[in-house]
Protein backbone atom coordinates (compact mmCIF):
# COMPACT_ATOMS: atom_id res chain seq x y z
CA UNK A 1 0.00 0.00 0.00
CA UNK A 2 2.85 2.38 0.85
CA UNK A 3 4.51 1.65 -2.49
CA UNK A 4 1.21 2.32 -4.27
CA UNK A 5 0.90 5.70 -2.52
CA UNK A 6 4.43 6.69 -3.53
CA UNK A 7 3.73 5.77 -7.16
CA UNK A 8 0.45 7.70 -7.09
CA UNK A 9 2.10 10.80 -5.64
CA UNK A 10 4.88 10.75 -8.21
CA UNK A 11 2.32 10.36 -10.98
CA UNK A 12 0.39 13.39 -9.73
CA UNK A 13 3.53 15.54 -9.75
CA UNK A 14 4.22 14.47 -13.33
CA UNK A 15 0.65 15.48 -14.21
CA UNK A 16 1.07 18.92 -12.63
CA UNK A 17 4.43 19.51 -14.32
CA UNK A 18 3.04 18.42 -17.66
CA UNK A 19 0.16 20.86 -17.28
CA UNK A 20 2.28 23.89 -16.61
CA UNK A 21 3.43 23.95 -12.99
CA UNK A 22 1.97 24.16 -9.53
CA UNK A 23 -0.03 27.33 -9.20
CA UNK A 24 1.49 28.92 -12.28
CA UNK A 25 -1.02 30.97 -14.27
CA UNK A 26 -1.58 30.34 -17.92
CA UNK A 27 -0.60 33.28 -20.11
CA UNK A 28 -3.78 35.35 -20.43
CA UNK A 29 -2.08 37.73 -22.84
CA UNK A 30 -2.53 35.11 -25.54
CA UNK A 31 -6.31 35.43 -25.25
CA UNK A 32 -7.30 39.03 -24.64
CA UNK A 33 -11.08 39.20 -24.22
CA UNK A 34 -12.95 41.40 -26.66
CA UNK A 35 -14.94 44.44 -25.62
CA UNK A 36 -18.62 43.99 -24.79
CA UNK A 37 -20.96 44.98 -27.58
CA UNK A 38 -23.36 46.80 -25.24
CA UNK A 39 -23.39 50.05 -23.33
CA UNK A 40 -22.70 49.62 -19.62
CA UNK A 41 -25.57 50.09 -17.21
CA UNK A 42 -25.43 51.54 -13.72
CA UNK A 43 -24.93 48.79 -11.14
CA UNK A 44 -27.61 48.07 -8.58
CA UNK A 45 -25.36 48.77 -5.62
CA UNK A 46 -28.08 47.88 -3.10
CA UNK A 47 -28.03 44.16 -3.94
CA UNK A 48 -25.54 41.98 -2.05
CA UNK A 49 -25.26 38.29 -1.16
CA UNK A 50 -25.68 38.86 2.56
CA UNK A 51 -25.43 36.19 3.67
CA UNK A 52 -26.63 34.04 0.74
CA UNK A 53 -26.86 34.61 -3.00
CA UNK A 54 -30.16 35.44 -4.64
CA UNK A 55 -30.79 33.58 -7.90
CA UNK A 56 -32.90 35.37 -10.53
CA UNK A 57 -33.96 34.90 -14.12
CA UNK A 58 -31.47 36.52 -16.51
CA UNK A 59 -34.17 38.80 -17.90
CA UNK A 60 -34.39 40.55 -14.51
CA UNK A 61 -30.91 42.00 -15.08
CA UNK A 62 -31.30 42.51 -18.83
CA UNK A 63 -29.57 39.34 -19.94
CA UNK A 64 -30.71 36.87 -22.56
CA UNK A 65 -31.20 33.36 -21.17
CA UNK A 66 -30.59 31.57 -24.47
CA UNK A 67 -27.29 33.39 -25.02
CA UNK A 68 -26.18 32.64 -21.48
CA UNK A 69 -27.00 29.01 -22.13
CA UNK A 70 -24.72 29.15 -25.17
CA UNK A 71 -21.89 30.40 -22.92
CA UNK A 72 -22.48 27.56 -20.46
CA UNK A 73 -22.69 25.04 -23.29
CA UNK A 74 -19.32 26.28 -24.57
CA UNK A 75 -17.77 25.84 -21.13
CA UNK A 76 -19.12 22.32 -20.67
CA UNK A 77 -18.37 20.87 -24.09
CA UNK A 78 -16.63 17.50 -23.97
CA UNK A 79 -12.94 17.90 -23.21
CA UNK A 80 -13.30 21.36 -21.70
CA UNK A 81 -12.98 19.79 -18.23
CA UNK A 82 -15.09 22.45 -16.58
CA UNK A 83 -16.26 21.75 -13.05
CA UNK A 84 -18.26 24.93 -12.55
CA UNK A 85 -19.29 28.28 -13.98
CA UNK A 86 -21.05 30.99 -11.99
CA UNK A 87 -22.20 34.26 -13.57
CA UNK A 88 -23.25 37.18 -11.37
CA UNK A 89 -24.74 40.50 -12.42
CA UNK A 90 -25.95 43.35 -10.21
CA UNK A 91 -25.22 41.27 -7.13
CA UNK A 92 -27.35 38.24 -8.02
CA UNK A 93 -26.62 34.87 -9.63
CA UNK A 94 -28.07 34.80 -13.14
CA UNK A 95 -26.56 31.56 -14.41
CA UNK A 96 -24.56 28.66 -13.04
CA UNK A 97 -23.79 25.11 -14.02
CA UNK A 98 -21.83 22.28 -12.45
CA UNK A 99 -20.25 19.08 -13.67
CA UNK A 100 -22.44 16.03 -13.20
CA UNK A 101 -22.24 14.92 -9.58
CA UNK A 102 -21.08 18.35 -8.33
CA UNK A 103 -23.06 21.32 -7.00
CA UNK A 104 -22.75 24.83 -5.55
CA UNK A 105 -21.09 23.45 -2.42
CA UNK A 106 -18.36 21.52 -4.27
CA UNK A 107 -14.90 22.94 -3.64
CA UNK A 108 -12.75 24.34 -6.41
CA UNK A 109 -9.28 25.85 -6.12
CA UNK A 110 -7.81 29.19 -7.09
CA UNK A 111 -4.28 28.29 -8.10
CA UNK A 112 -2.66 31.65 -8.93
CA UNK A 113 -5.92 33.53 -8.56
CA UNK A 114 -4.85 33.69 -4.91
CA UNK A 115 -2.25 36.28 -5.90
CA UNK A 116 -5.03 38.86 -6.30
CA UNK A 117 -6.31 38.02 -2.82
CA UNK A 118 -2.77 38.61 -1.55
CA UNK A 119 -2.76 41.98 -3.28
CA UNK A 120 -5.97 42.88 -1.45
CA UNK A 121 -4.36 41.96 1.87
CA UNK A 122 -1.31 44.13 1.19
CA UNK A 123 -3.73 46.98 0.50
CA UNK A 124 -5.59 46.30 3.74
CA UNK A 125 -2.31 46.29 5.68
CA UNK A 126 -1.48 49.68 4.16
CA UNK A 127 -4.97 51.02 4.87
CA UNK A 128 -4.70 49.89 8.50
CA UNK A 129 -1.23 51.37 9.00
CA UNK A 130 0.66 48.09 9.33
CA UNK A 131 2.62 48.85 6.14
CA UNK A 132 3.71 52.41 5.48
CA UNK A 133 3.57 52.33 1.70
CA UNK A 134 3.63 49.97 -1.24
CA UNK A 135 6.97 51.58 -2.05
CA UNK A 136 8.49 50.59 1.30
CA UNK A 137 11.63 48.49 1.08
CA UNK A 138 10.70 44.83 1.36
CA UNK A 139 13.70 44.23 3.61
CA UNK A 140 12.05 46.37 6.29
CA UNK A 141 9.58 43.52 6.82
CA UNK A 142 11.89 40.57 6.21
CA UNK A 143 14.14 39.35 8.99
CA UNK A 144 16.30 37.33 6.61
CA UNK A 145 17.06 40.34 4.41
CA UNK A 146 19.40 43.07 5.58
CA UNK A 147 18.54 46.65 4.67
CA UNK A 148 22.19 47.69 4.72
CA UNK A 149 23.23 49.13 1.38
CA UNK A 150 26.26 47.57 -0.29
CA UNK A 151 29.21 49.97 -0.25
CA UNK A 152 30.91 49.79 -3.62
CA UNK A 153 33.39 52.12 -5.26
CA UNK A 154 33.81 50.29 -8.57
CA UNK A 155 31.90 50.85 -11.80
CA UNK A 156 30.45 47.33 -11.62
CA UNK A 157 28.70 47.27 -8.25
CA UNK A 158 26.63 44.21 -7.36
CA UNK A 159 22.88 44.61 -7.04
CA UNK A 160 21.46 44.20 -3.55
CA UNK A 161 18.12 43.23 -2.01
CA UNK A 162 17.59 46.58 -0.23
CA UNK A 163 16.69 47.96 -3.66
CA UNK A 164 13.57 45.76 -3.82
CA UNK A 165 10.28 47.40 -2.82
CA UNK A 166 6.92 45.78 -2.11
CA UNK A 167 5.70 47.30 -5.37
CA UNK A 168 8.48 45.56 -7.29
CA UNK A 169 7.32 42.22 -5.88
CA UNK A 170 3.65 42.86 -6.69
CA UNK A 171 4.60 43.85 -10.24
CA UNK A 172 6.75 40.72 -10.66
CA UNK A 173 9.81 42.92 -11.16
CA UNK A 174 11.88 42.08 -8.10
CA UNK A 175 14.98 41.25 -10.12
CA UNK A 176 15.43 38.00 -8.18
CA UNK A 177 16.61 34.91 -10.03
CA UNK A 178 14.00 32.76 -11.78
CA UNK A 179 13.15 29.16 -10.94
CA UNK A 180 11.48 26.33 -12.81
CA UNK A 181 8.04 27.32 -11.49
CA UNK A 182 7.12 23.90 -10.04
CA UNK A 183 9.82 23.23 -7.44
CA UNK A 184 8.37 25.63 -4.88
CA UNK A 185 5.14 23.60 -4.81
CA UNK A 186 6.49 20.12 -5.39
CA UNK A 187 9.55 19.71 -3.22
CA UNK A 188 10.12 22.63 -0.83
CA UNK A 189 9.02 22.12 2.78
CA UNK A 190 9.97 25.71 3.61
CA UNK A 191 8.71 27.57 0.57
CA UNK A 192 9.40 30.96 2.12
CA UNK A 193 13.07 30.23 2.76
CA UNK A 194 13.40 28.93 -0.80
CA UNK A 195 11.89 32.17 -2.10
CA UNK A 196 13.98 34.50 0.05
CA UNK A 197 17.35 32.89 -0.65
CA UNK A 198 17.36 33.56 -4.39
CA UNK A 199 20.09 35.82 -5.70
CA UNK A 200 19.33 39.14 -7.38
CA UNK A 201 20.13 39.20 -11.09
CA UNK A 202 18.64 42.38 -12.53
CA UNK A 203 17.85 45.85 -11.24
CA UNK A 204 14.51 45.80 -9.40
CA UNK A 205 11.68 47.46 -11.29
CA UNK A 206 13.10 46.84 -14.75
CA UNK A 207 12.46 43.24 -15.83
CA UNK A 208 9.06 41.55 -15.60
CA UNK A 209 9.30 37.87 -14.70
CA UNK A 210 6.20 36.03 -13.47
CA UNK A 211 7.28 34.23 -10.30
CA UNK A 212 5.51 32.22 -7.64
CA UNK A 213 8.50 32.81 -5.38
CA UNK A 214 8.05 36.58 -5.55
CA UNK A 215 4.45 36.21 -4.41
CA UNK A 216 5.51 33.86 -1.61
CA UNK A 217 7.70 36.59 -0.12
CA UNK A 218 4.54 38.61 0.56
CA UNK A 219 3.52 35.93 3.07
CA UNK A 220 6.40 36.98 5.32
CA UNK A 221 5.77 40.69 4.79
CA UNK A 222 2.12 40.38 5.85
CA UNK A 223 3.07 38.24 8.86
CA UNK A 224 5.73 40.69 10.05
CA UNK A 225 3.57 43.76 9.47
CA UNK A 226 0.29 42.54 10.99
CA UNK A 227 1.44 39.96 13.52
CA UNK A 228 -0.87 37.40 11.90
CA UNK A 229 -0.28 34.73 9.31
CA UNK A 230 -1.69 35.69 5.93
CA UNK A 231 -4.29 32.94 6.32
CA UNK A 232 -5.48 34.36 9.67
CA UNK A 233 -5.32 37.96 8.47
CA UNK A 234 -7.42 37.04 5.44
CA UNK A 235 -10.01 35.36 7.65
CA UNK A 236 -10.21 38.36 9.98
CA UNK A 237 -10.05 41.29 7.59
CA UNK A 238 -11.29 39.99 4.23
CA UNK A 239 -13.19 36.70 4.19
CA UNK A 240 -15.36 37.50 7.21
CA UNK A 241 -16.24 40.93 5.81
CA UNK A 242 -17.75 39.48 2.62
CA UNK A 243 -19.18 36.30 4.16
CA UNK A 244 -16.65 34.16 2.31
CA UNK A 245 -15.34 30.81 3.46
CA UNK A 246 -11.96 29.83 2.07
CA UNK A 247 -9.24 27.36 3.03
CA UNK A 248 -5.82 28.83 2.23
CA UNK A 249 -3.02 26.27 2.13
CA UNK A 250 0.28 26.58 3.97
CA UNK A 251 3.66 24.98 3.48
CA UNK A 252 5.04 22.46 5.98
CA UNK A 253 6.52 25.28 8.09
CA UNK A 254 3.17 27.06 8.42
CA UNK A 255 3.77 29.84 5.89
CA UNK A 256 0.65 30.77 3.93
CA UNK A 257 1.17 30.01 0.23
CA UNK A 258 0.42 33.53 -1.00
CA UNK A 259 1.05 32.61 -4.63
CA UNK A 260 -1.74 30.05 -4.81
CA UNK A 261 -4.10 27.56 -3.33
CA UNK A 262 -7.30 28.90 -1.82
CA UNK A 263 -9.93 26.15 -1.81
CA UNK A 264 -13.48 27.47 -1.86
CA UNK A 265 -16.75 27.29 -3.76
CA UNK A 266 -17.29 29.16 -7.03
CA UNK A 267 -19.99 31.25 -5.37
CA UNK A 268 -17.48 32.29 -2.71
CA UNK A 269 -14.93 33.24 -5.35
CA UNK A 270 -17.67 35.37 -6.93
CA UNK A 271 -17.93 37.31 -3.66
CA UNK A 272 -14.34 38.46 -4.08
CA UNK A 273 -15.12 39.39 -7.67
CA UNK A 274 -18.14 41.41 -6.58
CA UNK A 275 -16.02 43.27 -4.02
CA UNK A 276 -13.80 44.48 -6.85
CA UNK A 277 -16.69 45.12 -9.24
CA UNK A 278 -17.94 47.53 -6.57
CA UNK A 279 -14.56 49.29 -6.12
CA UNK A 280 -13.78 47.63 -2.79
CA UNK A 281 -17.17 48.31 -1.20
CA UNK A 282 -19.38 45.70 0.44
CA UNK A 283 -22.93 46.39 1.57
CA UNK A 284 -22.26 49.97 2.62
CA UNK A 285 -18.76 49.39 3.99
CA UNK A 286 -15.50 50.28 2.23
CA UNK A 287 -13.44 47.10 2.74
CA UNK A 288 -10.64 47.83 0.28
CA UNK A 289 -9.86 51.56 0.16
CA UNK A 290 -10.51 53.42 -3.07
CA UNK A 291 -6.80 54.26 -3.10
CA UNK A 292 -5.77 50.62 -3.12
CA UNK A 293 -8.49 49.58 -5.54
CA UNK A 294 -7.25 52.18 -8.03
CA UNK A 295 -3.56 51.55 -7.35
CA UNK A 296 -3.70 47.77 -7.66
CA UNK A 297 -5.91 47.63 -10.75
CA UNK A 298 -4.04 50.08 -12.94
CA UNK A 299 -1.33 48.99 -15.34
CA UNK A 300 2.17 48.98 -13.94
CA UNK A 301 4.42 51.35 -15.86
CA UNK A 302 5.67 49.66 -19.01
CA UNK A 303 3.52 46.52 -18.68
CA UNK A 304 0.71 45.64 -21.07
CA UNK A 305 -1.61 43.51 -18.93
CA UNK A 306 -0.39 43.44 -15.34
CA UNK A 307 -0.84 45.62 -12.27
CA UNK A 308 -0.26 44.73 -8.63
CA UNK A 309 -1.00 41.00 -8.79
CA UNK A 310 -4.01 41.53 -11.09
CA UNK A 311 -4.34 40.79 -14.81
CA UNK A 312 -5.73 43.88 -16.54
CA UNK A 313 -7.45 44.72 -19.83
CA UNK A 314 -8.04 48.49 -19.66
CA UNK A 315 -9.68 48.80 -23.09
CA UNK A 316 -12.74 46.95 -21.76
CA UNK A 317 -12.27 47.82 -18.06
CA UNK A 318 -11.80 44.13 -17.30
CA UNK A 319 -9.68 42.68 -14.50
CA UNK A 320 -8.91 39.07 -13.68
CA UNK A 321 -7.70 36.92 -10.81
CA UNK A 322 -6.40 34.11 -12.99
CA UNK A 323 -5.05 30.67 -12.17
CA UNK A 324 -3.65 27.56 -13.77
CA UNK A 325 -6.04 25.61 -16.01
CA UNK A 326 -8.43 28.58 -16.29
CA UNK A 327 -9.43 28.71 -12.65
CA UNK A 328 -10.45 32.32 -13.11
CA UNK A 329 -12.43 35.20 -11.62
CA UNK A 330 -13.26 37.80 -14.28
CA UNK A 331 -14.63 41.22 -13.28
CA UNK A 332 -16.28 43.64 -15.72
CA UNK A 333 -16.68 46.71 -13.53
CA UNK A 334 -18.68 48.79 -16.04
CA UNK A 335 -21.16 45.96 -16.46
CA UNK A 336 -21.27 44.99 -12.76
CA UNK A 337 -20.58 41.49 -14.05
CA UNK A 338 -18.55 38.67 -12.52
CA UNK A 339 -17.71 35.41 -14.27
CA UNK A 340 -16.13 32.52 -12.34
CA UNK A 341 -14.90 29.42 -14.12
CA UNK A 342 -13.16 26.45 -12.46
CA UNK A 343 -11.59 23.26 -13.78
CA UNK A 344 -12.25 19.77 -12.48
CA UNK A 345 -10.48 19.65 -9.10
CA UNK A 346 -9.26 16.79 -6.93
CA UNK A 347 -7.64 17.25 -3.54
CA UNK A 348 -5.42 14.44 -2.30
CA UNK A 349 -4.49 14.01 1.33
CA UNK A 350 -6.25 15.06 4.50
CA UNK A 351 -4.72 18.45 5.32
CA UNK A 352 -4.39 21.83 3.63
CA UNK A 353 -0.64 21.69 4.16
CA UNK A 354 1.60 21.20 1.12
CA UNK A 355 3.65 18.27 2.26
CA UNK A 356 3.72 14.54 1.61
CA UNK A 357 0.55 13.37 -0.14
CA UNK A 358 -1.42 16.60 0.40
CA UNK A 359 -1.67 17.92 -3.12
CA UNK A 360 -3.92 19.71 -5.63
CA UNK A 361 -4.74 18.38 -9.09
CA UNK A 362 -6.85 20.16 -11.70
CA UNK A 363 -7.48 19.24 -15.31
CA UNK A 364 -6.57 21.60 -18.14
CA UNK A 365 -9.37 22.56 -20.56
CA UNK A 366 -8.91 21.52 -24.17
CA UNK A 367 -9.63 23.96 -27.01
CA UNK A 368 -10.51 26.72 -24.58
CA UNK A 369 -10.47 30.38 -25.59
CA UNK A 370 -11.20 33.12 -23.06
CA UNK A 371 -12.23 35.58 -25.75
CA UNK A 372 -14.83 33.22 -27.17
CA UNK A 373 -16.25 32.29 -23.78
CA UNK A 374 -16.41 35.80 -22.33
CA UNK A 375 -17.84 37.22 -25.54
CA UNK A 376 -20.71 34.75 -25.31
CA UNK A 377 -21.39 36.02 -21.79
CA UNK A 378 -21.22 39.74 -22.57
CA UNK A 379 -23.23 39.32 -25.78
CA UNK A 380 -26.13 38.15 -23.63
CA UNK A 381 -26.55 41.63 -22.11
CA UNK A 382 -29.46 43.61 -23.56
CA UNK A 383 -28.93 47.03 -21.94
What are these model-predicted stretches?
Residues 20-103, 108, 126-132, 375-383:
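N-terminal leader/targeting segments and the immediately adjacent pre-domain N-terminus
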Residues 91, 108-134, 169, 218-222, ...:
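Active-site SXXK
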Amino acid sequence: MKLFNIILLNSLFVLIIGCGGGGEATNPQEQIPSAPTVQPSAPDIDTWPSPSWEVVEPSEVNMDESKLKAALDYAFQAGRNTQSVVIVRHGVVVAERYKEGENKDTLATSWSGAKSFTSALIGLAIDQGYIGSVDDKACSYLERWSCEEVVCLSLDCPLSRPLISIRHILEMRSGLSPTDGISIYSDKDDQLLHSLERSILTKPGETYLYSNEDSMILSAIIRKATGLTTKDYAEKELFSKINMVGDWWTDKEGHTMTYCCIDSTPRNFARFGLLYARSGKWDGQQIISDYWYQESTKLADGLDNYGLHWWLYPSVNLIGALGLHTNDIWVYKDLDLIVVRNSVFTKYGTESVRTGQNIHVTTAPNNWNNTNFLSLVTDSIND
